[in-house]
Regions:
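Residues that scaffold the ATP/ADP-binding catalytic core of kinase and kinase-like folds
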Residues: 39, 154, 234
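The Walker A/P-loop phosphate-binding site
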Residues: 2-108, 119-128, 132
Length: 234
């Protein structure tokens, strides 16, 4: 044991510790719905994890933004000194919408992002600022990306401006790279990230199958991913 402690002391930092000393308490954010809680955590009294990535996928008008805002409201209500960074790619968040959902607008920052690179940069900088704050001065924080499917890439925009009719093959790798950088940082900071995403029909599947857009990047790092059905498919 002394040997292990010496290793931790020499090669570790504040996030390196013996497994027995790791805080094993699983914490959740109530989604505002017992059914939704049970779907994402296995308990009606649970919810989404407080330090992991949760993906909410579905077709248009299936309630992705609705559930995301419900989670934001419950998070802010539970943490009176907490705040939320809402990365909006659809210009869907308005003062009227927030007021109708009872969300404290003074504790929510709406960040408009157009490209994956822009989201990656702004999210990483925000987490870095949070981690540099003294731990006792850190207030509860959560991130929302709504939605991943609407993010473009710098290459796609450049090609469009130059009237190049070519397919952008870089998006999947950019998505994977962005979440590869963010996953551990968010975990260290205890910042939950809710990501909404679009789905598409898998061509050639034996049974009707839905898949999230953007490649496997989000699917491989999300602690929980939930696909919302359309009314006619229920």
């Amino acid at each position: 044991m002394d040997f292990l402690k010496e290793i931790v002391k020499e090669i570790g930092d504040e996030y390196t510790q013996i497994a027995a000393d790791i805080d094993g308490t699983e914490r959740f954010i109530d989604t505002g719905s017992y059914i939704f809680n049970s779907l994402v955590s296995g308990s009606i009294y649970g919810g989404v994890s407080t330090n992991k990535i949760t993906a909410i996928a579905g077709e248009t008008s299936t309630g992705k933004t609705y559930f995301s805002l419900a989670i934001v409201k419950n998070f802010l209500d539970t943490n009176p000194d907490g705040y939320c960074l809402y990365f909006d790619t659809e210009a869907a968040i308005t003062k009227g919408l927030l007021a109708s959902r009872g969300i404290d607008q003074n504790r929510l920052v709406v960040v408009n992002v157009v490209t994956i690179e822009e989201f990656r940069s702004k999210a990483l900088r925000a987490v870095d600022i949070y981690l540099k704050t003294e731990e006792e001065n850190r207030k509860p924080c959560m991130f929302v990306l709504d939605s991943l499917g609407m993010l473009s890439t710098e290459k796609e925009i450049t090609d469009a401006l130059n009237d190049k009719q070519v397919r952008d093959m870089t998006k999947s790798q950019l998505v994977k790279g962005a979440f590869r950088m963010l996953t551990l940082k968010l975990g260290q900071a205890n910042i939950p990230l809710i990501v909404t995403n679009h789905t598409y029909d898998v061509i050639g599947s034996y049974v009707p199958t839905k898949e999230m857009g953007g490649g496997s990047g989000l699917k491989s790092v999300s602690y929980t991913h939930l696909t919302l059905p359309t009314i006619y498919s229920v």
